[in-house]
Amino acid sequence: MSYELPALPFDYTALAPYITKETLEFHHDKHHAAYVNNYNNAVKDTDLDGQPIEAVIKAIAGDASKAGLFNNAAQAWNHSFYWNSIKPNGGGAPTGALADKIAADFGSFENFVTEFKQAAATQFGSGWAWLVLDNGTLKITKTGNADTPIAHGQTPLLTIDVWEHAYYLDYQNRRPDYISTFVEKLANWDFASANYAAAIA
C-alpha cells in the first residue's frame, strides 16, 4: 500500500498574493511529489511496506542505515502537515482551549508569535519551525532538513516550512517577510486547535 500525495486542501490560487500559484505548483506538484515517490520506491518490498508512514518514521528515526528512507518519509509527512497548517484568510489568533494554553505556557499570544518568528528565522539552512505539545507543555521547536517532531515523541500542532523552495519565488531571500505573512495571513488555527484537542482527549 503506497503513500499517496494528498491534494492541496485549497485551490492553487487561493493563497495569492501571499503564496502564488507558481510556488504551490512547484512546491506541491514537484518537491512534495518527489518525496512521496522516493519514499514509496524506498519502502517497497521491505518489512515496513504497508505500515502507516508515521509508524515508519518512528521506527527508523536515528538509524543511519535508513537515512534515505527516513528523509523522504519525514519530508512527505511534514509537507502534508504543512498544507493543513495554512489556509486562505488564515492568520489571526486561536480561540478556546488552545488560546488559553498558549497564554499559560508562553505568557501571551504575542510572546508566542515573537518566539515562533525567531525560531523560523534562525533555523540555519533548510528546515521547519513547529508549535508542539511535549509532555503536556506547548513548546516551539525547529528541525533541520527532514527532521520531524514525531520522531522525538512530540505532537505537532502547526508548522511553517522554511526550506527556500517554500518561499523563494515569492519572497527571494526575505525569509522574515514570509514568516510574518504566515503568522498574519496564512496560519490555520482551526487545524492547530483540532490537533490540540485530539492530543489532550
UniProtKB/Swiss-Prot annotation:
InterPro entries: Mn/Fe_SOD (IPR001189), Mn/Fe_SOD_BS (IPR019833), Mn/Fe_SOD_C (IPR019832), Mn/Fe_SOD_N (IPR019831), Mn/Fe_SOD_N_sf (IPR036324), SOD_C_sf (IPR036314). It catalyses: 2 superoxide + 2 H(+) = H2O2 + O2. Its EC number is 1.15.1.1. GO terms for molecular function: metal ion binding; superoxide dismutase activity. Binds 1 Fe cation per subunit. It comes from the Bacteria. Keywords: Iron, Metal-binding, Oxidoreductase. Its cofactor is Fe cation. Pfam families: Sod_Fe_C, Sod_Fe_N. Transmembrane segments: none annotated. PROSITE patterns: SOD_MN. Fe cation binds at residues 27, 79, 161, 165. Homodimer. Destroys superoxide anion radicals which are normally produced within the cells and which are toxic to biological systems. Belongs to the iron/manganese superoxide dismutase family. This is Superoxide dismutase [Fe]. It comes from Synechococcus elongatus (strain ATCC 33912 / PCC 7942 / FACHB-805) (Anacystis nidulans R2).
